[in-house]
Amino acid sequence: IVYQPWTYLQTEWLEAKGENLNAAIAAHPELEFYAYYIEKDTDIDFTTGQKIDASESMLSMLNLPDSHKGIYEINSFEEFNERFYNTDHHWNYIGSYEAYRDVLSVLGGGEPLEPTGVYHSGLRFSGAKSKQFSRFFSDEMTIYSFASTPRWEYM
């Protein structure tokens, strides 16, 4: 992983994102909004441990109470390596479960489902990051299993 310093263009992009989200919040006062920032390998220089603070910058722009904001923090390469796929920018089963518990807490939800086991599918896939390496690398698709899952309704 090669760290790239934060640029002015990225700051402009972040500010535009914040303005768009605030416009949506203002346009729909009948809805409750929540924001959850996911730190990833582009948010921290793993050599020095220095963060770009995009998470704090982004969330501080939003017209939301602090109780409606959350951050999935990555503080070291070890944490990143444990929680994200090697070949992709998405969480693996460990990271997605940690985020699920965290988001549930931010939303004021109930008790989280607890995994009953780990399922190793044996299936391999090459994520978006592997394109940079001519697809020489792959990850195994591994997920938690649960006894039951609740039914959800979405708008």
Q: Which residues make up each language-model segment?
A:
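Extracellular glycan-modifying ectodomains
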Residues: 1-155
